[in-house]
Amino acid sequence: MKEVREYIKSNTEGFASVEIVERENNHGCGVNIVEGITQVSKEFGRVIVVEDDILTSPYFLTYINDGLELYKDDDKVAAICAWLDPQYTVLGDKLPESFFMNVVHIWGWGTWWRVWKDYEFDAGKLLEQIKAAGREDEFNLGVKSKPNSKNLQLQAAGKIGTWDYQLCASAFLHNRISLSSRYAYSNNIGCDGTGIHCGPTDYYKVNVRLSEEYHPLKKIPIELNEEICTIRRRNLWIKEFKRNSRIWHTLRKIYHFIIGKSKKSVKDSKS
């Protein structure tokens, strides 16, 4: 911890001013981030959030600031998101310059106090409100296993320590949607197994490069992109199928067994 603090203090060039908040105790990921966003957004009316495993394009701040200014008076907009989910790239040239989606991607993003003041950290309370509104199926994109509800339940039970599931649920309850761009202005380089919430994977590196030029934002109608919603629904269903299907797990075991034997045969033939 001491090394991290000293490193931060020695790398403050390029900023007009830097305020470092040092905790006496480890507040954990969720509480610490929520308190930080609350403090900054309340004081300045808006906030840009970048965690320590996020790599940004040189135009990241320009993009986020332009978005925050463009939609500052539009209550239906929850956030401006810089990260481009690789699953959206299947649309190819049909992917718009910018679009609205029913999720908040928190790997480099910005929002306003007008939105953040409605944030609810209590996941159990959020799930109760979603059920009371008769919107649980909509919240889970029609996936019968209710993966989004399960995430809130895990958080409420203390089995995970997150804050972003609550952000998405809070935005959902207030009928807010988020802006994203076809150009990636941020990327997560922490999915290498060294972090808390993500195991090693190359998924987030596929087909996505940080933008090396800026593509000026133009204000568009605030409405969900249905093609993006369809992609998210399909991929969420596939993810749940893989997680819960005995057939899928059996096929994986067979695949790894065959690959293992194949590698062993190649090794034996070379020796």
Predicted features, each with a name:
Residues 1-49, 54-271:
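An acidic/histidine-cluster motif and surrounding catalytic segment
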